[in-house]
Amino acid sequence: MAATKANIYFKGVEIPTSSHPEIKKLKKKSNVHYMHGNKVWNSTLILMELFADINFNKEKIADLGCGWGALSCFLTKKGADITGIDSDVNVKPYFDLMCKLMDVDTKFCVQNIFSDEFDISPYRTFLASDVCFWDVHTDLWIKFINKIIKENKRLIMCDPGRESFWNLLDQCDMPYQIINRRINSPRRVDSYITIFGE
């Protein structure tokens, strides 16, 4: 379905935009996001479309840089045992609102995924959409990818094709699969899905 000013209706769920009344209330009383968790990014919709017909059957998934949690909550409805992870504590009220709108109880964790303290052992699959903003993080992502591949885990990354994303792929020695995916509704989105690991 098409987007309204305040909502996106997609794959059977309601996703608030920055114009949603509850989002406006949160922005008035909440701290400013210091990362990029200030909206639902387009690559999230691409992954939602990709996973729409899959029953995850309690698969343990980590949604890295989850922001408002649209993907986390959507996959909870699809049967995943998913945790939304973000380094910005200020996205938590937005994540809670998303849970309320989608009628789910999805786990949320504040964590720097590049820290040695981040325990990857509970998860089989890691998702990351629209996270490649800065070249300064390229080495950190490569280290993280190497870490999970050695543990026979996988990362599914989605990005519209930023220069920093291509730089990451150029510098990463690990094999990967890449797919270009497009949707025309509720927004016109063109992104690249990259899969590291089996």
Predicted regions span which residues?
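S-adenosylmethionine-dependent methyltransferases
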Residues: M1-E198
